[in-house]
Amino acid sequence: HSFPTRRSADLALDHGAVPMTARVPRCVVDLNRGPDEIDPLVVSGVAPAALNPRIMAGLGVIPRVVSQGRAIYDRPISLAVAQQRIERLWHPYHRALAALIDEAVARFGGAILIDMHSMPRDALAHLPRPRPDFVLGDRNGGSASTRITSEIASAVQAEGFRLRRNSPFSGAYIATTYGRPRQNVHVVQLELDRSLYMNERMVEPRVDFGAFALRLERILKRLAGLRPDACDSSIAAE
């Protein structure tokens, strides 16, 4: 997903990682949801069946709310519009992502996907202080090996950032779907507090953006050096 600076994506590429950036605003279609996670309060003509907590919270594949529970729509959209978004935006992204993973497995015997997101500061408002700067999610050990998760955590903490694991975000559709550590495919979700690099109210970079970008680049350099290991004995029980 989106990096705070293009230099960070370029650096990852320089060190052998392949950056893949989502260009679709999450309020249009959420790529970290399943294509069937459709909210009947947003999309007309959908039966209210099999509602999971994400859909009930208004955070399905077509989100109903943004931060602080603010409504996106004043009326439901049609099922045809929702299906068009999913077909034109969701499916191409996931086809490309699956192809990259398959290519890595074919060439190197395994793959590591670091699914990076930024989160609004208020997403952590309910947590006790000091609040984390990053939240690492590996589905509580289900989407990545302990070794790889620990190395990612170490890279973040080495730059002085506070990190929390699997709470309040343990990973969603991407980690659940693509994380197969026993097949040497590891997925870790990294949520970073966007107030670290931008003024959220003014929607502009902070004055110390450059210093943050350098810290993030050092993290990405370490992450780009990670290697999957088919003999890794630290894979958590699924």
Language-model regions, residue ranges each:
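Internal, conserved structured core segments that host functional sites
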Residues: 57-102, 108-109, 117-120
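C-terminal helix-cap and adjacent tail motif
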Residues: 51-65, 140, 144-148, 152-157, ...
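Short, small-residue-biased leader/transition segments that mark boundaries at the very start
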Residues: 1-8
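Short, glycine/charge-rich beta-strand/loop segments that flank catalytic centers
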Residues: 18-34
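Catalytic cores of processing enzymes, dominated by hydrolases/peptidases
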Residues: 92-198
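Short, His- and charge-rich active-site/binding loops that engage polyanionic ligands
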Residues: 29-75
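A structural motif corresponding to the C-terminal end of an alpha-helix
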Residues: 9-18, 104-107, 158-160, 219-226
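His/Asp/Glu-rich mid-to-C-terminal helical/loop segments that flank catalytic regions of hydrolases
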Residues: 200-238
